[in-house]
Amino acid sequence: MNKNVLYRSIPKVDILLADEGIKVLIEAYSRESVMEAIHSEMEKLRAYIGTCDDEEKAKHQIALLNENIAKAVAAMHTPNMKKVINGTGTILHTNLGRAPISYEHMMKAAEIVSGYSNLEYNLEAGRRGERYSHFEKLLCKLTGAEAAMAVNNNASSVLLILSSLAKGGEVIVSRGELIEIGGKFRIPDVMEQSGASLVEVGTTNKTHYEDYEEAITEETKALLKVHTSNYRIVGFTESVGIDELVPIAKEHEIPVVEDLGSGVLIDLEKYGLTHEPTVQESIAHGADVVCFSGDKLLGGPQAGIIIGKKKYIDMMKKNQLTRALRIDKFTAAALEMVLMEYLSEETAVQNIPVLRMIATPLEEIEKEARSFVRILRHTGMDAKIQMVSCESQIGGGSLPLERMESRAAIQPNGMSVAEMEEKMRHLEIPIIPRTINDSICLDVRTIERKDYKMIAAELAELLGKKEER
């Protein structure tokens, strides 16, 4: 095998540019994109020939050069971020975007932000306004807080709160609440960035009322309570609640801040889950400032929502960090749309996808699974399809011990689970499954009914028909 001959047989750039198919690509995209693809694919081809020991395979790859250039150009102009089907049963899947936002809410928000809007314009007064005004009254009405604002995520909330209330001073927090929120971002590190000094009290499993009292000095600027929404310590434990911290803080004239993490506005116990502290409860117990995520149990866009006493919220609004951390117009619009649903709990559970998934009873899940299985079987795909029991979970650092009984459609077939899972990730609309006992499963709790037929069609194309095998 003479590799020099193979290298010389690769078409030169000017010959490729004269090709009719390449000319069509230039017209459809741009000369710059096509040239980039040509150079990239030629480099890959040379590298392949350099390691290939099969002359016929090398010639075949040379013959595919134009086709590969076309694919490369198309890939350059195809958005990398795309819709995926979440078949994992994890409702708040961090890697899949956490809370899905309803199509209706997004369309309403898109209508507002696709043109000009009154984002920071007071239509009544005819002058500059606040971007928080669109949802501040709603948040106060729903939670009982005096004032509210939002920044780009909940870590930003903690950063802004501590920078505004405790910069240069000390903040007391229980050792059992020094959480890591994912991606190695930790509460102590966020506190350090705020300019506040951390004072740890208690132990990992036990912190007492007296621990806070004894740690307060003239340098103490706030007491911080962090709800461990992404893990639980069980067994020989004790912690100090907000209602116990408030009297201590009042005595020393310092604020109590609670980071609720996932943040929930309705009691989830009525839907079969254990009690998760609500935002309203925190305010009712006397917390001066409360922060929580917008894209977790609230079911909205990514945001760090801050509510509490007006004097403290006003301090944060004036902090120079606020401009760096502020939310954009799309987030502001989407957040208002989602919060409006909470004016009626029944409406919220129906129209906010996260709440609907959580609240759907097992009987309804079974009905959906049977319907999904029928659609899958109707395609005649080469697979054994059946309904199996499984457990869904909340995910996203929320209610870590909770599992909800669910149902999944399962497709064992001729290819291995690893091979099928890999192929599903590369479909036009990727499908992200879970595996149970070495089988591919699709949990219907996190799959929308409108996607059943599309999923069935994609899998049928992937697996082929039974008679074709």
In which residue ranges do the predicted regions lie?
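Structural motif of enzymes handling amino- and sulfur-group chemistry
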Residues: 311, 319-320, 327-378, 388-391, ...
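A short linear hydrophobic-aromatic micro-motif
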Residues: 80-81, 148, 429-434
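Short Gly/Ser/Thr- and Asp/Glu-enriched loop/turn motifs at secondary-structure junctions
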Residues: 10-11, 85-89, 298-301, 404, ...
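Glycine-rich phosphate-binding segment of PLP-dependent enzymes
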Residues: 43, 47, 87-88, 98-124
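Conserved C-terminal alpha-helix-loop-beta "cap" of PLP-dependent enzymes
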Residues: 362, 366-450, 454-455
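Long amphipathic alpha-helical segments
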Residues: 1-73
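Long amphipathic N-terminal alpha/beta scaffold segment
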Residues: 51-101, 107-108
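Conserved PLP-enzyme active-site core in the AAT-like
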Residues: 126-342, 458
